[in-house]
């Protein structure tokens, strides 16, 4: 340490009243400043976690649609049903994490185009409190797939839905942080012009969530 820097740090320490606190003391003090999260969490005791997620995700504000399947192997059929319902070509850009599924009858690619009509991705989890999806970037779950498709089909494991935001990230400090971590809450939209909600302004116009399990 340079003598100039040492002098500065010593002066700061003296001004603060002596020795610097240990990391444990600092952590304990910080935790004492954080209120119990339950104080600010919305109560929905009459609903199960998944029922709350369904209600929020399909609300008028978020405008997502839902399908439920029993197994991850059923995802391609759920996607085919969505294509048929919306008159779409059976073609999609999919996350590499889903490439091993049987996509017979659907033309797939793991590369995504700027004008992609349909993208199919795998969510890391969900949050019942807000109806949000959690996406972590990785080679198997590239982030652009969540934003470039006009129709975004997101695959979500039922057991990965947390009740509250805090629960979704409890213990996250033990995991390696991804390069990008995104929370997606409903379809893309803006109400900047005349307070009219325009869907698809900055991303997917349609969000379809396939819940597995």
Where are the model-predicted features located?
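The feature marks the mature, well-folded catalytic cores of soluble enzymes
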Residues: 1-213
